[in-house]
A protein has these predicted regions:
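N-terminal leader/targeting and assembly helices and adjacent pre-domain segments
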Residues: 1-199, 289-294
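Acidic, glycine-rich two-metal-ion catalytic cores of nucleic acid-processing enzymes
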Residues: 201-294
């Protein structure tokens, strides 16, 4: 499941980079001279051709009717900014690519979390023989808006910062005159960690958003499963729980496990008391319990 989610996130990153690359190259081919393209050349009034590029970029967003308010608000803002001058229009086009990628990641994460939550709720329902009313209480956690509120807000904050960083990289090169080689360098991605330079490569900076989306999926999936489990345990009268480390768990989680069992209302939370990407779990504390099902 992680591989499928990761592949989708990688696809969104590639689409965002291709979108930005296509439009930057179009502006370069339109306005560059023998010395490249400079900030002076883009600090001009928006032309008819520029507006055509903007309309094309907007059309590439597709149907935005089901986009979240966070995305629609940002689209409105960048629409106003785009009309200031050519430089701001370029910034706004970059923002559009990032916004679309963030919407895709948000939908991908939401779908994955709901799937994981429902799977865990079904597992708990079967194992503990929950009544229909009890099952509804458990599944209500999955659809609670508060479940997605915090991580989605953080996703958009990170998205805004990343868009700003990419815009900064482009504008820094424009200040000194951007050659075609400079443009290619900005857009070059590096799979080798030793070559990874998010402070110099827009592609590498955008890739950081992909890594962030992966972290959110793993972290929030673990949080949701933990909440589903703990609500179920309380309903079934469980008084103590054991912390069960995932294979290859870190020293922190091993220490948490060794300090168990914990009272149901005093047990460490996943991931708040462990760490992002934690895949440990908690099970009812029963002497000589066979843990294989959990």
């Amino acid at each position: 499941m992680d591989d499928q989610t990761d592949q989708q996130s990688s696809q969104y990153t590639a689409e965002c980079l291709a979108f930005i690359q296509t439009h930057l190259m179009a502006f370069y081919e339109r306005y560059a001279d023998d010395e490249g393209i400079s900030l002076t050349q883009v600090k001009q009034r928006v032309s008819k051709w520029d507006m055509g590029q903007w309309k094309q970029a907007i059309s590439q967003m597709g149907d935005v009717s089901d986009w979240p308010d966070d995305a629609k608000q940002r689209m409105t803002i960048v629409g106003f900014i785009a009309g200031i001058d050519r430089s701001h229009l370029l910034d706004s086009i970059i923002s559009l690519g990032v916004i679309k990628m963030t919407v895709s990641n948000q939908k991908n994460i939401t779908h994955r979390l709901q799937l994981d939550g429902k799977t865990e709720a079904r597992r708990m329902g079967d194992f503990f023989d929950l009544t229909s009313k009890q099952s509804k209480k458990v599944t209500s956690i999955i659809t609670d808006p508060e479940t997605t509120k915090i991580w989605s807000q953080n996703l958009w904050v990170d998205s805004d910062k990343m868009a700003g960083d990419v815009q900064y990289l482009v504008n820094q090169h424009l200040k000194h005159g951007m050659s075609l080689n400079d443009l290619n360098d900005i857009l070059a991605s590096h799979a080798n960690p030793k070559q990874f330079k998010p402070g110099q490569s827009a592609a590498d900076r955008i890739s950081q958003m992909e890594f962030n989306a992966r972290r959110i999926v793993r972290t929030e999936s673990a949080r949701l499963k933990d909440e589903v489990n703990m609500v179920t345990y309380r309903m079934k009268g469980v008084t103590k729980v054991d912390w069960v480390c995932e294979p290859g768990a870190c020293l922190k989680c091993q220490g948490i496990e060794e300090l168990g069992p914990y009272p149901i209302n005093g047990a460490p939370d996943i991931p708040d008391d462990s760490h992002p990407n934690c895949r440990c779990s908690k099970i009812p504390h029963i002497e000589n319990l066979n843990r294989s099902y959990f």
